[in-house]
Amino acid sequence: MKLNIVSSLVLLQSLACSALNAPFSVSGRWIHDSKGEVFTYAGANWPGAGEVMIPEGMQYASIASTVSKLKGLGMNVVRLTFPIELVDDILDKGGDVTVQKSLINALGSTNGTKVFDQIRKVNPQIKSTTTRLQVFDMVAAECNKQGLYIHLDNHISKAMWCCSRTDGNTWFGDTYYDVAKWMRGLEYMVSHAKKWPNFVSIGLRNELREPSTINTQYPYNWGTWYTQMTTAAKRVNAANPNALIFLSGLNYDTTLAPIPTASDLGNGVRFRLSDFSFANKLVLELHNYETGATSCSALSGALWNAGFKAQNSSDPSIVNSMPVVLTEFGFLQDSTTWKNVYASCLRTWIPEQQAGWTTWVIAGSYYIRQGTQDLDETWGKSHSQCVAMLQRLICAGMLDHTWSGWRSRNAIEQGLKVMVQSSLKG
């Protein structure tokens, strides 16, 4: 009987894995899986770019439990964020460090040891010798087992909470944004991810934004964007030709306006897909946190002009017909906010565009964020307290503090789950 049970479990796992059809490719505005079927991203962000440099929440919930919650909503992808500092440590400091040491470095000896013991209790596969990147491997493996794809996102260079104009991670050449190390880190991660059968794509950089200090070597403009992003894309493609490459825009990734029409980016430079041998691997990504929107037509119109019009291949003004994925958006997880203009508009409009998306954020709490340990995703009591700089909603955690259940079942069942179903109805 025991043998039969084990055999059944192995069979179920293999069936789940066999349902994944990587690698992906792009044709015009569509993303296709390896069988040629259209694939629409419908998933959530799982942060792993904080000071501990492993995916959040493992002291509260097993990897399998968190993945199963996403799978239970019908989601098909996880946007897994990482910092370049993780790779810098591996390549410049003699190799990766253990999870235990990383926790102690970030939280101090007492709290770091305490949280590590909690992690081991909930995730016994994480040992005293387990390194940070091995935890990323574990998350990827569990997602593969449960039928979810992995989209890596380079969220930041120096591990910390993102984003502001003064955090040193804003733009090429900023205090911590070493361009050479950034490109090296991207190459390393996509090379490492070759062993993940469910790895399909990477975002080159999260939320490029104007730095507080001017850097004459890397002026904040589209010309610099073109040079650095296309160079990075070429290096990523050379390191892993199978990976889709997501290009983010300016102003916290809220605009890619000149890209669909191949407008002049300065000095006659234009982004043209035809210039790239790997054009079938390029995707655009945008973020939106206009949570105070009062008009769906205004919100959707702004998104369209910001870059979603790249999906309109019938418009003769569109030179670069490309997929566009909304890789970040989020709203307060309570009993009513899912009904407001912002949430309801995106829930309807994005599926109507047959566009992909990943919501911010699965996390219910953080090991440490902005100096506060075990910070709850809804530390603010009022809506105004939940809004940080530049209208970024920071009370968008889908899970409760202990990652054991949904923070608001209404927001999930009548909000995000409906959006998943609308996006994937075929």
Tell where the protein language model's regions lie, with residue ranges:
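A generic structural signal for short, non-catalytic loop/turn and secondary-structure boundary residues
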Residues: 19, 34-39, 277-279
